[in-house]
Amino acid sequence: MPGREHRGVAGKSSGGYGAMVVPMLRPDAFGALASHAGDALFEYCYLPEFPSIARRLRDDFGGSFDELLSTMREAPSFDWGRFGDAFSMYAYACAYTPDPDRPGKPLLPFDPATGRLNEEIWQRWLALDPVRMAEPYADALRSMRRIYLDAGRQDEFFLDLGAQAFSDELTRLDIAHTLELFDGKHGGISYRYPGAIRQLVLSLREP
């Protein structure tokens, strides 16, 4: 079954972001999506972390992501408590705003030494927020055979609010979808996957 009408994509967290965005960009390839706590409403899921990451960089890594990366390479193992949040933000920047003049390096949405917002780069991030992408890609979303969204009401990154905001945009654009909010946080939600996969299978199977 090679056609897009029989191909769906699902993911959680950053993978949930991809599950929302890839079908918008490639409706020729995918005909349904399921997103579990996908990154959305960037001003809530990313922006609040910038000050604490700037502090961590200042206090532990000389205000430099390069120093963070060098220290990580030399560490005997990956210490999530020490490296995780800052490294994740660096990875997001590599994905959203890669530096065309420095392959493998990002353009950062804030000054790592002070935390001061770089408005130009931040606006480029916001342009990639699923909530803001919904309207310009409404036709692609409207072509989906199934759109399923869920998130925990106690998600630490406020991705329940992101899912709700994306859902509200879909409703405003008259795009059919399902949103389920449940009691839970960001982790420990893999039990939600089978139900979403079942919905995709039912929508993508041969009639």
Language model: regions and residue ranges:
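Non-catalytic cap/lid and distal C-terminal segments of serine-dependent acyl enzymes
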Residues: M1-P207
